[in-house]
Amino acid sequence: MLTLTRLDSAQPDFQARLARLLQFDDATDASIEEAVATILHAVKTRGDAAVLEYTERFDRLPAPSAASLELGAAELAAALAGLPEDTRAALEAAADRVRRYHEKQLQGSWTYTEDDGTVLGQKVTPLDRVGLYVPGGKAAYPSSVLMNAIPAKVAGVAELVMVVPTPGGERNALVLAAAAIAGVDRVFTIGGAQAVAALAYGTETVPQVDKIVGPGNAYVAAAKRRVFGTVGIDMIAGPSEILVIADGSTPAEWVAMDLFSQAEHDELAQSILLSPDPDYLDAVAAAIDQLIVEMPRAEVIRTSLTNRGALIRTHDLHDAAAIANAIAPEHLELAVSDPEALLPKLRHAGAIFMGKNTCEALGDYCAGPNHVLPTSRTARFSSPLGVYDFQKRTSLIHVSEAGAQTLGRIAATLAYGEGLQAHARSAEYRLTHK
């Protein structure tokens, strides 16, 4: 029998116990930081030569030149053509849904004109070039390609450069096919911190990008953190999370499997169930014990649920919503009979899955919204990856002669108050009646 943490929001020490449950040490190992710093410096100063050395060392992939590590469009097309018909259809259907959803996020430029003829506005511009990191080797994450690449393309990014490690030369056809479907422009078979460095600084062969997105291991995360400022990054993601609020109307087996869906990612993933019904919590616990023996990743799930999972009894659904807001989970499932009634109470979550038919796994692959979501309580101030992450906004100011008279006097007064005489004089030069 799996031992799960059981909490009750009525307990005097509930908040302290919940805080301990949510604690996660995201400090990067000093040896990783040191190794990443060395790799970044080498690639920054030595370019292609360093990339080739690290690719041979870490991926066991010797290459005569950095150019030979680039895959041509024909290879991506061949990977797509070689897929089983049902797999290709599923990828294309998912891509279409992701594309249609993200097209709703497009923002355009705008202006307005004041009474004196002054025009103010905002110019929205896509980024020029974006780098996409995709885990490679035996791990197949075609969904990650779609979720990162499609919003960039919808935003109008001119060039999307994907890096994907191929340990021992092992290429993943699903990943390459997804790149073809998503419209990735260039693909390099490099990975790790050296790939992040190549994208951030540019080499003789790999072009420098403006922003790097996509998941990776601890070395990739450390590298992204270090190059931020030279380039933009999407986020530094923590372990996967799911929080389920249930009223007992959803079969216990369904909710148990939903908890598994995040727990199977890794031992640090967090799966929590909130319910005011203690009998239902018992039923889910029993379902967990019954179903876990069927799972290929049972040991990972068991470790995750034992160390970081919890079944929490709440006073009512409103109490559950308040706890959910404090946790600010990556994925929030509302396994309740009336999710619309509960929705106004919820403020902080990466994505909200409403109703018993809406399992989190659908959002991971094909519902349409992005599966790149804030973790580790950052949903309190962060949003899912979207088209807006690949656009930037520039303020527009076109002051008329009449406007310069009013604004010039205001600006000069404030500038003199701050002791910035050149600012003040610059505004005063535009005054026709001084």
From Swiss-Prot:
Keywords: Amino-acid biosynthesis, Histidine biosynthesis, Metal-binding, NAD, Oxidoreductase, Zinc
Residues annotated to bind Zn(2+): 262, 265, 364, 423
Binding site for substrate: 240, 262, 265, 331, 364, 418, 423
PROSITE patterns reported for this sequence: HISOL_DEHYDROGENASE (PS00611)
Source organism, top-level taxon: Bacteria
Gene3D superfamilies assigned: 1.20.5.1300, Nitrogenase molybdenum iron protein domain
Record-level Gene Ontology MF annotations: histidinol dehydrogenase activity; NAD binding; zinc ion binding
Catalytic activity, as annotated: L-histidinol + 2 NAD(+) + H2O = L-histidine + 2 NADH + 3 H(+)
Catalytic site: 330 (proton acceptor), 331 (proton acceptor)
Binding site for NAD(+): 133, 194, 217
Pfam families per the UniProt record, alphabetical: Histidinol_dh (PF00815)
Pathway: Amino-acid biosynthesis; L-histidine biosynthesis; L-histidine from 5-phospho-alpha-D-ribose 1-diphosphate: step 9/9
InterPro entries: Ald_DH/histidinol_DH, Histidinol_DH_CS, Histidinol_DH_monofunct, Hstdl_DH
Enzyme class: oxidoreductase
Textual note on the cofactor: Binds 1 zinc ion per subunit.
Cellular component GO terms, alphabetical: cytosol
The EC number(s) this enzyme carries: 1.1.1.23
Record's function text: Catalyzes the sequential NAD-dependent oxidations of L-histidinol to L-histidinaldehyde and then to L-histidine.
Family label: Belongs to the histidinol dehydrogenase family.
Name the record gives this protein: Histidinol dehydrogenase
Gene from which the chain derives: hisD
